[in-house]
């Protein structure tokens, strides 16, 4: 079932790590960021070993992660879900769109559309997904002849954005009640609606969300606290330390950074560009000189008797930050 999957890797023991019961350490969900990053790299580099690994990973995703007939995306291998997790759908759609320039298989794009259609059929318009760029999917479909699919997704997306604008800063709870990556999708989606339509009202609607997002940011001189959005529970879920406590940085902090970079590109806001680039570069400290990486850094000295001030040894899904760096750093 796991043939071709990219799994977590424990840098201390030198072994792969897999836990089907603890779903943040399985082969799906955020782990798909590894394949997304590899696809982005292979768009500009030639490497036969990496290409072979990508093909095996895509085969795994098609076999185990989603149903091409229905667009359903699953939480676990063998196309199994104990509950609906809408976060997963756009990530798989993004993965297929990133792989398309490498493999040139147009069914990847038609599958990417079906997944987004399934996402909206299951209530996605009331959800705030993170790490997804719907405008780019719309434009990719159009550029590759999927005109009807592009128009349908555009309609769904703009209706989704209208709900976000209407709701304002009364954010709905998701897997937690309130956190940084409930705000980042509001900024990203409203901004993409502006870039699609050039409707100036979106630039006005985005301002309260930008103000809310900035409240998560550290402004201290140390690189782990400088334009890094604070997060609290990530090392409990994504690393074997399993400790609560501020994770500074965690790769999802970079979602704030790319929102600032995209906003600067649309408006010419040089200060937000500086802050976005700074925060995204700071997140790259999760990648070590020896080629290993960390899912998060537990920042406090100690949390409930557990030693902190260290990088978690598990290489989990931090490759999203590297993907964003490839995509957005000047």
Language-model features: locations:
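Solvent-exposed loop/turn segments connecting transmembrane beta-strands
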Residues: 125-126
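Well-ordered alpha-helical scaffold segments within catalytic/enzyme domains
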Residues: 22, 30-48, 90-105, 121, ...
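Short amphipathic alpha-helical interaction patches enriched in hydrophobic/aromatic residues
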Residues: 169-172, 264
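Carbohydrate-binding/catalytic loop surfaces
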Residues: 2-23, 70-90, 132-147, 171-192, ...
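Helix-terminus loop motifs that line ligand-binding clefts
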Residues: 48-87, 218-224
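Terminal, non-catalytic domain-edge segments
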Residues: 159, 163, 189-330
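An acidic-aromatic substrate-binding cleft motif
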Residues: 1-62
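Extended, well-ordered alpha-helical scaffold segments
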Residues: 45-64, 103-122, 146-168, 198-216, ...
């Amino acid at each position: 079932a796991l043939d071709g999957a990219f799994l977590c890797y424990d840098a201390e023991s030198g072994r792969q790590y897999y836990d089907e019961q603890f779903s943040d350490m399985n082969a799906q969900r955020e782990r798909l960021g590894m394949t997304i990053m590899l696809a982005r790299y292979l768009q500009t580099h030639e490497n036969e070993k990496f290409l072979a690994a990508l093909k095996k990973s895509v085969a795994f995703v098609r076999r185990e992660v989603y149903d091409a007939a229905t667009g359903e995306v699953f939480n676990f291998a063998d196309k199994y879900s104990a509950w609906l997790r809408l976060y997963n759908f756009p990530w798989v759609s993004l993965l297929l769109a990133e792989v398309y320039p490498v493999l040139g298989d147009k069914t990847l794009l038609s599958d990417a559309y079906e997944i987004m259609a399934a996402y909206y059929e299951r209530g996605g318009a009331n959800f705030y997904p993170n790490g997804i760029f719907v405008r780019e999917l719309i434009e990719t479909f159009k550029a590759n002849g999927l005109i009807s699919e592009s128009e349908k997704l555009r309609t769904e997306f703009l209706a989704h954005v209208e709900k976000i604008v209407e709701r304002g800063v009364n954010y709905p709870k998701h897997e937690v009640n309130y956190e940084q990556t409930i705000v980042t999708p509001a900024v990203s989606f409203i901004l993409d609606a502006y870039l699609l339509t050039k409707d100036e009202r979106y630039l006005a609607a985005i301002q309260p969300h930008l103000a809310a997002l900035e409240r998560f940011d550290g402004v201290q001189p140390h690189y782990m606290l400088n334009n890094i959005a604070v997060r609290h529970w990530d090392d409990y879920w994504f690393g074997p330390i399993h400790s609560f406590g501020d994770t500074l940085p965690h790769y999802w902090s970079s979602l704030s950074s790319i929102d600032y970079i995209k906003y600067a590109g649309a408006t010419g806001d040089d200060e937000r560009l500086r802050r976005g680039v700074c925060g995204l570069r700071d997140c790259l400290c999760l990648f070590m000189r020896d080629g290993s990486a960390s899912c998060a850094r537990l920042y406090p000295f100690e949390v409930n008797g557990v030693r902190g001030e260290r990088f978690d040894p598990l290489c989990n899904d931090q490759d999203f930050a590297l993907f964003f760096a490839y995509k957005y750093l000047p």
